[in-house]
């Protein structure tokens, strides 16, 4: 007994990670299909470490009738074409693109934060997965908001190149190698050299001077957690392959000591607190890669504002920021709304 699942975009970074996580979490499957563009038709992908190979089908020709859920990791343009088709056929779409996140008829879900919002999925038969940088942030904020009511958040991100896909990872690798041997580098995926550099620019610029990535963090956090929270973000691309980091300053309505915050975070779902005030007593992206937890370190009181705290938040962006959250949504949907076939 299980569900019939489709993974769309199975040849990309996030799609492959979805397959890994479905396998490692032993998701109850009656059947699984993998689809992608015509370029990948006939290719084979691994179903995690099970030893099972799955043949990629052309999404354009795939009939979703009779399938329970589809995990989409195919980008907004392809999602715009295929998500309505899958949803109309009765296959619930869990979408990793930005296309539907702010649609009022589509729930935007982080299961540790707003699981009850999933009950509204039937309006479109589509559920949205948040931006990678938003997902880990709201996991960290939720238990603290419940305890002391957050007024304002200031976040600076340090986002890995895998957030820009395989091309971003390839560009960091190739530029690093070129610099070591004295060759020149030409940016392609990124606007400037990414190797041995940081770039304060992710996605397009908006009229107010912010970037779309920063806007996403603001509006998605409000939709998922609380529309009254004020948030400002600066999003930066850094020369790290996997793992997003965030320096977060939080201002609360009510007093919350660093010690009390640590106790709350230690017990919160999805969070691993690693916070020793000593050399190496914190988590970096290297340790988070391949892990499902959202790691919190450096929790301390901010003396410049009343009821303020600072913290450091790290997570594998391909997992909690994308693939893991999608699988967790599928698990939640199955428990609450779907019957196993």
Regions found by a protein language model. Give the residues of each.
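N-terminal Rossmann-like NAD(P) cofactor-binding subdomain of oxidoreductases
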Residues: 1-194, 230, 258, 263, ...
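Generic solvent-exposed, charged/amphipathic alpha-helical segments
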Residues: 19, 218-222, 262, 266
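Histidine- and/or cysteine-centered catalytic micro-motif in compact active-site loops
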Residues: 37, 158, 199-203, 234-236, ...
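Helix-loop-beta segment of a Rossmann-like dinucleotide-binding subdomain
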Residues: 121-128, 197-208, 311-313
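A glycine-rich, Thr/Ser-enriched phosphate-binding loop motif common to dinucleotide/cofactor-binding enzymes
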Residues: 125-136, 209-218, 321-325
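Short acidic/glycine-rich loop or secondary-structure boundary segments that cap or lie
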Residues: 163-166, 206-209, 240-244, 258-259
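Oxyanion-binding "anion nests"
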Residues: 194-241
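C-terminal active-site/capping subdomain that shapes the small-molecule cofactor and substrate pocket
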Residues: 229-341
